[in-house]
Structure formats: structure tokens, C-alpha cells
Amino acid sequence: MKKISVYFIMLLLSVASLHAAAQITPTALTKKQVNDWFQKREWLAGLPLQPHASINKTVFARQYQLNKNYWDKAFAFLKEHDLATMAAGRYAIDGDNVYAIITENPTKVVDSAKWESHRNYIDLHLVIAGEEKIGVADITKLTVTMPYDVTKDLMNYSGDGNFYTAVPGTFFLFFPLDAHRPNITTGGNKPDKKIVIKIRYAE
């Protein structure tokens, strides 16, 4: 009898655990819950940055819940390093799950910059010094010019989108449905220094 009672209690605990998990599953978040979570900025862990208004908050909340460890490591990297003094190159954060690429390049005229998107990774873009324009568009509203290349995790497009000026202190996030057109000049052949953190996308 005691053995049956123990199994019954364990079953109840398992069901309760699954129920609790269902209550916090990212797909169950309401718009208000997403907005509250986003506005609290606890996920920044004190990092003095501003998320750009173009960020899809619902997708961000879901990805953060699914891969919290990856996101925390990405934001910790930004907080713990003096980006202004770091050389251009690739920096490991969590193997192939999270890594950073710092570049210092002249910005381009808009016709030289391509629309792109990625399936396996989310892009976090942050200008460290200088400025650039970044285009943002829904991939469903663009025309594919280069089919998905699995080795490069890259797809290119043509079409129209919205353009924003990226400056130090504000970061952009681009998810698989977000085409982006970065490194565009704001006038003249100005160089800028930026960091892109690649964060593995959770299906």
C-alpha cells in the first residue's frame, strides 16, 4: 500500500511539474506578459544598452525563454569586455552556439549592400564606434535572389524595407524572418566598428 502511495505521489508531482512548465511556456505568453518582460530589462543584467524599436519582442521573449543560457552569455560578453579596444576578429562565447564577430570596415552605398537572413542563428548587431544605416524587412515581402546556402547559413533578397541609423548604445536583433541590410553609409565613405553576436536559434 505504501509503495502504491509513493508512486501516486510521484505521479502527482510529475503532473504538477508539467502543468507548471506549461504555464510559463514561451508560446503561452500574452502580449502584456511579453511587454512587461521586455520593459523590465532584467535580461540585460544591468548592461547599459537600448534595444531598437524594430525588434520583434514576442519572438525575442520566446527565444530567450528557450535558450536563456545563450542570451545571458551574449549580454555578459558585451558587459564584461571593453569593445572599443578589441581587435577585429571572431571571439568564442559558447562554442558554435554563441560567438561574436568584430569588424572595422568602410560603410557602403546602399546598392552595394545586400538583404540577407539566416535560419540557424539570430544576429545581434551593435555599432561600437561610428554609425551606419541598417535596413529591416520581413522576408515574406522580399524577392529571393540567392536561395538558402546551408554552409553559409545565408539567403539574399531584393526589395524594399525600412532603414534606421545604428549608433553606439542601441542594438538590433534579427531573427530568421527578419531580413537585414547592414553596413550602409550615412554619408560619405565613413568607417564604423561594430560587433555582431551570433546566437543559435531555437526551433
Briefly describe each language-model feature range:
Residues 1-29:
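Bacterial Sec-dependent N-terminal signal peptides
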Residues 34-102:
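A short, N-terminal "cap"/entry segment at the start of jelly-roll beta-barrel domains
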Residues 82-144:
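Mid-length scaffold segments of soluble, non-membrane domains
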Residues 120-124, 132, 162, 170, ...:
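Generic beta-strand structural signal
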Residues 131-166:
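A short beta-strand-loop-beta hairpin characteristic of the jelly-roll/cupin
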Residues 165-183:
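Conserved metal-binding segment of the jelly-roll/cupin
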Residues 171-173, 189-203:
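A short hydrophobic beta-strand segment most commonly corresponding to one strand
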Residues 184-188:
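Short proline/glycine-enriched turn/loop segments at secondary-structure junctions
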